[in-house]
Amino acid sequence: MALQQTLLITGASSGFGRALAQAALAAGHRVVGTVRSAQARQEFEALGAGAIGRVLDVTDVEAIPGLVAELEATVGPLDVLVNNAGYGHEGILEESPLDALRRQLDVNVVGAVAMMQAVLPSMRQRRRGHIVNITSMGGFITMPGIAYYCGSKFALEGISEALGQEVAALGIHVTAVAPGSFRTDWAGRSMVRTPRSIADYDALLDPIRDARQAKSGRQRGDPAKAAQAMLALIEAPAPPAHLLLGSDALALVRDKLDRLKADIAAWEAVSRSTDA
């Protein structure tokens, strides 16, 4: 068995967070999971002796430093932070209120950054640690109707990569994990949908929305297998800066990169024309 580590996983009540917690506990690690209610905390701690629950809303950024300090004092050093808390927003950009964008960024980006800032001092002092940010293939590719969500995941991908460069010499690893479509509740009850109002977009979005809802719960990706992949990542001595999960993510991101390379080549002369 790999050396026992203590993981702090946000959003541990369901989806990837719960699957990773179960896999890590089975592998002999300790897991602190943040959840949104006292009942969810009880359910999480029932997973096993190594499961430690805490109630936290990641948008309450002022509460995060105190929580991390309390955990370090009572549980011990936190070896791995997994920023998993998040949700998806679906809506045409023109129809979606700015408050929906602010909420999306508060949960998916600001909360994750606050968690990173809270664990970094101890990791930096110990010259050891691993931060894993669960992003999405939507942090590399885009599709109509999830502009706010993709924007939040593009942001977290960039933040993860830049932070990794800042802390690499300090013994701290940062990995952005980008899953494809998995059998989680992302497209189900956890997704926030802005009501439709502009008929011009019906032909574009309605089929996409219908297909997404029809596929929910039947996606190819298996959360339990994703958890094993993330566990291997956490236990790796030299983890990557980016990790895609799922054959769909591989295919779609490779296609995006090919199209990006083609655009760069087609417009290379214009790009170079701006040099003095």
Regions found by a protein language model. Give the residues of each.
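Residue(s) in the substrate-gating loop at a strand-loop-helix junction
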Residues: 136
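A glycine-rich helix->loop->beta "capping" turn
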Residues: 70-83, 89
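SDR active-site lid
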Residues: 169-240
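Substrate-binding pocket helix/loop in short-chain dehydrogenase/reductase
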Residues: 92-93, 97-102
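Conserved glycine-rich cofactor-binding loop
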Residues: 13-14
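Active-site helix of classical SDR
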Residues: 116, 152
